[in-house]
Amino acid sequence: MGVGVVAVEEVGKEIVMKDGSKFECVSKFCYLGDMLTAAGGVAEASIVRTRCAWKQFQNLISFLGKRGVSLKLKGKLYRSSVQSVMVYASETWAMKVGDEQRLERNENAMLRWMCGVSKKDRISSKELRDRLSIEGVLEVIKRSRLRWFGHVERKEKDDWVSACRELEVDGVRGRGRPMKTWRECVNT
């Protein structure tokens, strides 16, 4: 008899399956470093990944903030330690514009801190990325999405991943702009 959690709107209930496993109902939970919520979406996950990246950045600030260290070395350390934490598990996210802006905004703040530059200096974020020899966080996410898409495409057609990818949900959509699908994120 297993015990687990499932994210649903009705918090506090227990769901019991036929085999006797019990699932506690919660509004959100962390699974493999990714936040899953009852409402869906990736806003909570992107916030958590950003906080984790800032924690990692703060751990390395004594080195990344030094003036005597070359920018290329800072860029390599940032890319391997901080940026990798920020984009962990993001290849499956279907992000909204606000989520993308949150990640970019936080990355730009870290880059300015590393380079010792303020917004008053009027140096673009692209220029800072060039100085540090790093890709932007959204380009890294796009590359990892394409890599993951390749894995999914090579799966056998009767695999559950392929079935989920081809799944079409019946019913009527709510009002407003439709949610962006993961496939639409890959195609852009």
For every predicted segment, state its role.
Residues M1-T188:
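Short linear motifs embedded in intrinsically disordered, charge-biased segments
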